[in-house]
Design a protein with these regions (language model features):
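Conserved RNase H-like, two-metal-ion catalytic cores of nucleic-acid enzymes
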Residues: 1-109
Length: 109
């Protein structure tokens, strides 16, 4: 089951819920416009129980409602996160905290 988050009200509620998580799986979808410009379209988040699809296009301008992404207390697990981080930064103008990249971890096995 998944939930589409496309309103500020729903995103505020979700943010509070996700701030209580120890870890989250995160992925993004984005549109790259040339070499330098990137537009974040969707953030997919799973908290081991449910999946949430945050529609960044419908939400429009970032209004500081994804605090879970920047919390040192919540580990964010990505796979090959280089472009995901770039896309999230393009929307929020903030750097992620406490991230784990499974692709990098695999290279140590």
């Amino acid at each position: 089951m998944f939930h589409i988050i496309d309103s500020e009200r729903d995103l505020k509620i979700l943010d509070k819920e996700l701030m209580l998580s120890n870890h989250l799986a995160v992925d993004t979808e984005f549109n790259r416009k040339g070499k330098e410009e990137i537009e974040l379209c969707l953030i997919q988040v799973n908290n081991s129980e449910e999946t949430f699809l945050i529609d960044c296009i419908l939400l429009g301008e970032y209004k500081n409602n994804c605090k879970f992404l920047f919390s040192k207390d919540v580990k964010k697990i990505f796979h090959s996160f280089r472009e995901d981080v770039e896309a999230i930064y393009s929307w929020t103008q903030s750097k992620l905290e406490n991230v784990f990249d499974s692709q990098v971890a695999n290279s140590f096995l």
